[in-house]
Amino acid sequence: MAILISPSNNTGWGLGTHKLFGGAKQKSDQHPVYVQAHYRAPWGSKGRRRPGRARGVPLDPKTEAEVVATIDEVARNGPPAARLVLEAARRVGAYNLRRARKLTPAGRAMAAMRARQMVNQAKRRKRRVRSK
């Protein structure tokens, strides 16, 4: 994704994901900054440093209340790509640690199976509540 930094006359220059683009080779009234000599602003490097979100609901529920909370979250937001699934996939060798962070086909199958299980549990729980 690029950030467009444009002067008022809209001549358009900006920051790409890895480099600057557009602009002029010489400074002028139309281009107040010439891109080749421009440096990346200090705030431009902070995008990848944001901390991960803390989850309010445990991914490996132990108590009945935690199970209900997890199922409710799955019903609201869809099945999560659970940390538990990825850890289990690593243990069985379904996660290729040498490459970029991508699940192997076995890991994807395992994640899909876990998601299906959680959805089915939620459906069963709904049926049980309706029948009472």
Curated annotation (Swiss-Prot):
Induction description: Expressed in the late phase of the viral replicative cycle.
Site (described: Cleavage): G23, A24
InterPro entries found in the cross-reference section: Adeno_VII
Keyword DNA-binding assigned: yes
GO biological process terms on file: symbiont entry into host cell; viral penetration into host nucleus
A GO cellular component entry from the record: host cell
Keyword Glycoprotein part of the UniProt annotation: no
Post-translational events: Cleaved near the N-terminus by the viral protease during virion maturation to form the mature protein.
Domain of life: Viruses
MF annotations from Gene Ontology: DNA binding
Residue numbers covered by the propeptide annotation in the UniProt entry: 2-23
Record's keyword terms, sorted: DNA-binding, Host nucleus, Host-virus interaction, Late protein, Phosphoprotein, Viral penetration into host nucleus, Virion, Virus entry into host cell
Short sequence motif Nuclear localization signal: positions: 124-132
Misc remark: All late proteins expressed from the major late promoter are produced by alternative splicing and alternative polyadenylation of the same gene giving rise to non-overlapping ORFs. A leader sequence is present in the N-terminus of all these mRNAs and is recognized by the viral shutoff protein to provide expression although conventional translation via ribosome scanning from the cap has been shut off in the host cell.
Family membership: Belongs to the adenoviridae histone-like nucleoprotein family.
Known function: Plays a role in the inhibition of host immune response within the nucleus. Interacts with cellular nucleosomes and immobilizes the host immune danger signal HMGB1 on chromatin. In turn, prevents HMGB1 release out of the cell and thus decreases inflammation. Also plays a role in the wrapping and condensation of the viral DNA. May also promote viral genome import into the nucleus.
Known partners and oligomeric status: Interacts with the core-capsid bridging protein; this interaction bridges the virus core to the capsid. Interacts with host NPM1; this interaction might play a role in placing the pre-histone-like nucleoprotein on the viral DNA or regulating viral gene expression. Interacts with host HMGB1; this interaction inhibits host immune response.
UniProt-recorded name of the protein: Pre-histone-like nucleoprotein
Organism: Canine adenovirus serotype 1 (strain Utrecht)
